[in-house]
UniProtKB/Swiss-Prot annotation:
Alphabetical list of InterPro entries matching this protein: NAD(P)-bd_dom_sf, SDR_fam
Binding site for substrate: 136
Top-rank lineage group of the source organism: Bacteria
Organism: Mycobacterium tuberculosis (strain ATCC 25618 / H37Rv)
Name assigned to this protein: Uncharacterized oxidoreductase Rv0484c
Record family assignment: Belongs to the short-chain dehydrogenases/reductases (SDR) family.
């Protein structure tokens, strides 16, 4: 077991190698947390941890043994940010790729379950724990071509909201963050590295950036312990739903 040499509160952030996870790690570190950055890409989280004075732990949330090792490595956890996740493809149900569906389920749903279950005893023992789960507006909406992702995100949201009730009376708060369009590596992963397709997702609009979501997570993490922000939906001004958005001329 690793005892972090600080009396600071400890925040574990999954998917911390880029995007919302990286921005959240930086935000929480600036607020005084000792951040444990968790992701698969060792080079990125090691550099991040060095920059923010945190700890890097390489782990894949789809790997049972890796998540168990993560839990053993930590002597204290005050905040958990379940951020690891993603989408694959944009096929209609009739053309669904089962491997894509399996990946999305294992990463978004079972990944959140594995990490939360493994760290929950330490969050309770902290006496003032917080679980933030980054879902998506896809957890509350559906859209054509998005069934695999929306199904996974609906399930992830249901997991989180169920836990909210199951932990009543325990010293742990739970907040679901449901972002809309955020320009990160998300679309690049979804379209298997096709930069042109990824760029087209945000063309003609002003999307959120990772720091926008991280700022909200930082706000949640610094509320008094009796205040529970159950769900926060955050979209760009240009987006009303997953399928409704404003488009401006490209200058």
């Amino acid at each position: 077991m690793t005892t972090i040499g600080t009396r600071k509160r400890v925040a574990v952030v999954t998917g911390a190698s880029s995007g919302i996870g990286e921005a959240t790690a930086r935000t929480l570190a600036a607020q005084g947390f000792h951040v444990v950055a968790v992701a698969r890409r060792a080079d990125r989280i090691t550099a991040l941890a060095n920059q923010i004075g945190g700890t890097a732990i390489v782990a894949d949330v789809t790997d049972d043994a890796a998540v168990e090792a993560l839990a053993r490595a930590l002597s204290r956890v005050d905040v958990l940010v379940n951020n690891a996740g993603g989408a694959k493809g944009l096929q209609f149900v009739a053309d669904a790729d089962l491997e894509h569906w399996r990946w999305m389920w294992d990463t978004n749903v079972l990944g959140t379950l594995r990490v939360t279950r493994a760290l929950l005893p330490k969050l309770i023992d902290s006496g003032d724990g917080l679980i933030v789960t980054v879902t998506s507006i896809a957890a509350i909406e559906v859209y054509d071509g998005g069934a695999g992702y929306t199904a996974a995100k609906h399930a992830q949201g249901a997991l989180h909201r169920t836990l909210r009730g199951e932990l009543l009376g325990k010293p742990v708060r739970l907040t679901e963050i449901a972002p809309g369009a955020v320009e990160t590596e998300f679309s690049l992963v979804r379209f298997d590295g096709d930069q042109q397709r990824a760029d087209a997702v945000y063309a003609g609009m002003t999307p959120l950036v990772a720091a926008d979501v991280a700022e909200v997570i930082g706000f949640v993490a610094t509320r008094p312990s009796h205040v529970n922000l159950d769900q926060i939906v955050i979209r760009p001004r240009d987006q009303a739903s997953a399928s409704r958005r404003a488009t401006h001329p490209v200058r």
